[in-house]
């Protein structure tokens, strides 16, 4: 039995599906997008759509009017989507003259990392796609946010640095050539472990240097990339060219709005590796990714999407250069003092929408009237902000940033006087421009809105002109508008009246003026739509001519929003301005954990001091019982350094911070089953990374290093780590080491740069009272059994533990209890 030949339409589907690859294919058929075979089953399972069959082929459909909603749902679940459209007229076969299917082909792809306009785009988060390339031991990557056009490249010297950089960016999609994906499985697995992302591959040739560099020079219309500062960055250029080709040639997406790729100077940033970003809960709480108790949530007082994205970018990659920090501190201080000005500007900032992404929609032809209206309102708010700032003596950070370009001022005036207040979603809905924008627009709308009024007025006028009181204007579907008079009055009509029809006792006429009115009425909607469509295109073109000026305005407002957000935070929380310089000092007086402080009643959080001067103290050994605040304190120091190097005020009475180049943390651990690594192995790997990469300007936070093995092994490892960080040249980082190993505290006696501190506890009738104060000296007791009791241990177990502890601390050996002395615990 021969296999049934597919219909011409299904042949089209198979051709499109081959192009779609691993994407779900939505195939336009009339008023629906259909999915077939496995794609139909997938839609049924993930979108709860009805699964049907036709000739044994599974199929499922989505109405054209709601396709974007369903595409977003698929993308949100991590799928890629290809959309095939129908166009033209049905094809005719030459010989039989039979009507064939309409032409169909894929017109666009949608992937998680290439969203242009979607409900999935979060206002204050970039949506990145990152492409990776490797040459020898050197990695290059290119990072693009297609929704804003932001594009930059970077190179990394090793796998750890590459993974940290990509995790810091948290892309939605990672792209590589097929060869890289198949060879670098360890990198792929690490990225999948840390991030929820889509992995995509593209042709190897697109990442070859000759093609990639030519792709970039052609797109940006230059002869060489050297003028962009990209000279010699071969792996990164290859990644950028491969990414651009993937977007343009594979996904068929618009790219003319993509900015010239920038390079990022890593030496000018405080580097925070992936583990530290997670451990310090910069973006999300450890045990609650959607929770609010992160540093980002506490610090974010921004009013605009651009300002929110800028805050997040700086939080995960703060400044290193004291000059950059100082100018932002000055700006924060200025607005902290100018309370009224700050509030006024905040009011206008709240009226500013996402100018970056709106401009992308204009550039790619996706903008509707409402988008242009939103731009108008945002521009107007920006102009009001500049007007507020005009009379102020601005700090250095805002010099040359807060003056309105004259061309942009003219555009704002044009938008304000030409667009209606309440704008439609689509151009085809009409009523975009005010009547006064164009005479033809005014005339057509007037005729449309006052057609019956015009008929009555015209009827009265020609009655007076002819003297025929019974003359009337009527309408018939076949004739349209006509003038009717009794047959006896027909000779009295002027010669320019044109006879249309004769009846038994009446004659019907028209006039050139009535015909013009008839033409206007019959085509008025079409004419209005044609006119407004052209006017809208012209307006968008005019906006695009000022794209550079508009994006400069967007960046200026983002900077302003960022600074005012920090000023609001400092004002609301009573923060202080830290002194930040190139010294070897880390001194904080009455510092508080910025997140923990907000979770307790006002005045209840206990502040603590930190004093580390390179010539005196480089390492603090911190002992004390669990739950006494050790981990909170050491995290607190890292968070305050990050805030200070963002240009922010910090929760302290005063502070002097010499800039830190890198922050490392080793806090807690869990098994990494995907890599076959135990808790202890994870701990050792992270500690090894610190030992290899820390410098004498780094800050190292170590919590209980060595606890995952036997006591002596753990103690030996912990002391070796301490000595390495104390005595190895160029590795003498400022270190806070929380430990239960009392033996380490003796290092203070013969190491001049070590100081012992402990989390204070008061012993009250045998019960510990946690003071949450960090005090000089080492702890005498750990109070671990007390913590076990608080955790709900059975009292018999607690009692036995206390007995064993007394025996361990005394001269006698541990006794084995009688079987009946110990209550048997059930498993369930």
UniProtKB/Swiss-Prot annotation:
| GO CC term, one of those recorded | cytosol
In terms of Pfam families, this protein maps to:
MutS_I, MutS_II, MutS_III, MutS_IV, MutS_V
Keyword Cytoplasm listed: no
* Keywords noted in UniProt: ATP-binding, DNA damage, DNA repair, DNA-binding, Nucleotide-binding
Checking InterPro entries in the record gives: DNA_mismatch_repair_MutS, DNA_mismatch_repair_MutS-lik_N, DNA_mismatch_repair_MutS/MSH, DNA_mismatch_repair_MutS_C, DNA_mismatch_repair_MutS_clamp, DNA_mismatch_repair_MutS_core, DNA_mismatch_repair_MutS_N, DNA_mismatch_repair_MutS_sf
Q: Which CDD domains does the annotation name?
A: ABC_MutS1 (cd03284)
SUPFAM superfamilies hit by this protein: DNA repair protein MutS, domain I (SSF55271), DNA repair protein MutS, domain II (SSF53150), DNA repair protein MutS, domain III (SSF48334), P-loop containing nucleoside triphosphate hydrolases (SSF52540)
Residue positions binding ATP: 624-631
Q: Its Gene Ontology biological processes? A: mismatch repair
Gene Ontology MF: a single term? mismatched DNA binding
The answer to whether keyword Transferase applies is: no
| Family statement drawn from the similarity comment of this UniProt entry | Belongs to the DNA mismatch repair MutS family.
What is the role of the protein in this entry?
This protein is involved in the repair of mismatches in DNA. It is possible that it carries out the mismatch recognition step. This protein has a weak ATPase activity.
Known NCBIfam families for this protein? Answer: mutS1 (TIGR01070), PRK05399.1 (NF003810)
Specify the protein name: DNA mismatch repair protein MutS
């Amino acid at each position: 039995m021969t296999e049934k030949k597919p219909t011409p339409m299904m042949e089209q589907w198979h051709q499109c599906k081959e192009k779609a690859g691993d994407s779900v294919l939505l195939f336009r058929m009339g008023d629906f997008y259909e999915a077939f075979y496995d794609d139909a089953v997938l839609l049924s399972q993930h979108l709860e759509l009805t699964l049907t069959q036709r000739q044994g082929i599974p199929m499922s459909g989505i109405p054209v009017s709601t396709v974007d909603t369903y595409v977003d749902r698929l993308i949100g679940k991590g799928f890629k989507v290809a959309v095939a459209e129908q166009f033209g007229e049905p094809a005719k076969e030459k010989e039989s003259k039979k009507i064939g299917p309409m032409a169909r082909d894929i017109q666009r792809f949608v992937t998680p990392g290439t969203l242009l306009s979607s409900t999935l785009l979060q206002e204050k988060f970039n949506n990145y796609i990152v492409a990776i390339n490797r040459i020898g031991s050197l990695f290059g990557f290119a990072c693009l946010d297609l929704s804003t056009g932001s594009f930059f490249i970077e190179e990394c010297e090793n796998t750890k640095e590459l993974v940290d950089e990509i995790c810091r960016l948290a892309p939605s999609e990672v792209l590589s050539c097929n060869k890289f994906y198949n060879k670098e499985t360890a990198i792929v697995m690490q990225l999948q472990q840390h991030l929820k992302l889509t992995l995509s591959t593209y042709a190897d040739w697109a990442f070859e240097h000759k093609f990639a560099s030519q792709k970039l020079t052609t797109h940006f219309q230059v002869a060489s990339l050297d003028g962009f500062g990209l000279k010699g960055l071969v792996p990164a250029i290859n990644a950028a060219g491969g990414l651009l080709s993937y977007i343009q040639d594979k996904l068929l997406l618009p790219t003319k709005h993509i900015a010239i790729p920038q390079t990022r100077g890593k030496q000018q940033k405080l580097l925070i590796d992936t583990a530290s970003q997670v451990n310090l809960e910069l973006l999300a709480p450890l045990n609650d990714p959607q929770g609010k108790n992160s540093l980002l949530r506490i610090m974010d007082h921004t009013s605009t999407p651009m300002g929110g994205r800028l805050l997040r970018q700086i939080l995960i990659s703060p400044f290193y250069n004291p000059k950059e920090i100082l100018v932002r501190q000055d700006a924060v201080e200025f607005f902290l003092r100018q309370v009224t000005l700050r509030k006024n500007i905040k009011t206008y900032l709240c009226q500013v929408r996402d100018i970056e992404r709106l401009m992308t929609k204009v550039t790619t032809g996706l903008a509707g009237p409402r988008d242009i209206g939103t731009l108008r309102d945002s521009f107007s708010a920006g102009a009001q902000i500049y007007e507020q700032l005009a009379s102020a003596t601005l700090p250095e950070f805002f010099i040359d940033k807060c003056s309105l370009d004259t061309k942009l001022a003219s555009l704002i005036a044009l938008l304000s006087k030409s667009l209606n207040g309440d704008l439609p979603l689509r151009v085809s809905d009409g009523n975009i421009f005010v009547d006064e924008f164009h005479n033809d627009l005014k005339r057509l709308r007037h005729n449309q809105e006052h057609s019956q009024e015009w008929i009555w007025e015209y009827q009265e006028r020609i009655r007076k002109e002819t003297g025929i009181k019974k003359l009337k204007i009527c309408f018939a579907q076949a004739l349209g508008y006509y003038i009717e008079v009794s047959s006896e009055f027909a000779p009295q009509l002027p010669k320019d009246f044109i006879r249309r029809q004769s009846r038994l006792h009446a004659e019907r006429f028209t006039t050139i003026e009535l015909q013009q009115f008839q033409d206007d009425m019959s085509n008025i909607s079409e004419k209005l739509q044609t006119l407004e469509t052209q006017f809208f295109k012209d307006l968008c073109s005019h906006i695009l001519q000022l794209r550079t000026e508009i994006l400069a305005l967007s960046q200026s407002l983002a900077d302003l929003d960022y600074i005012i957000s920090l000023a609001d935070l400092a004002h609301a929380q009573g923060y202080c301005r830290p002194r930040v310089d190139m010294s070897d000092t880390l001194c904080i007086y009455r510092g508080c954990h910025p997140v923990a402080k907000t979770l307790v009643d006002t005045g209840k959080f206990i502040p603590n001091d930190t004093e580390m001067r390179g010539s005196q103290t480089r390492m603090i050994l911190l002992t004390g019982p669990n739950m006494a605040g050790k981990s909170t304190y050491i995290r607190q120091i890292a968070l305050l350094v990050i805030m200070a190097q963002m240009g922010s005020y910090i929760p302290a009475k005063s502070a002097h911070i010499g800039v830190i180049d890198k922050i490392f943390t080793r806090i807690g651990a869990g098994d990494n089953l995907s890599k076959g690594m135990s808790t202890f192995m994870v701990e050792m790997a992270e500690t090894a990374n610190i030992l290899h990469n820390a410098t004498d300007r780094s800050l190292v936070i170590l919590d209980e290093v060595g606890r995952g093995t036997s006591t002596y092994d753990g103690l030996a490892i912990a002391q070796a780590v301490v000595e390495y960080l104390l005595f190895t040249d160029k590795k003498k980082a400022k270190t806070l080491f929380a430990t239960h190993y009392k033996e380490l505290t003796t290092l203070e006696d013969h190491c001049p740069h070590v100081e012992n501190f402990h989390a204070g506890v008061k012993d009250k009738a045998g019960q510990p009272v946690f003071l949450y104060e960090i005090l000089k000296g080492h702890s005498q007791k750990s109070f671990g059994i007390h913590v076990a009791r608080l955790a709900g241990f059975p009292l018999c177990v607690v009692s036995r533990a206390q007995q064993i502890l007394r025996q361990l601390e005394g001269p006698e050996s541990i006794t084995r209890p009688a079987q009946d002395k110990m209550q048997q615990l059930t498993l369930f």
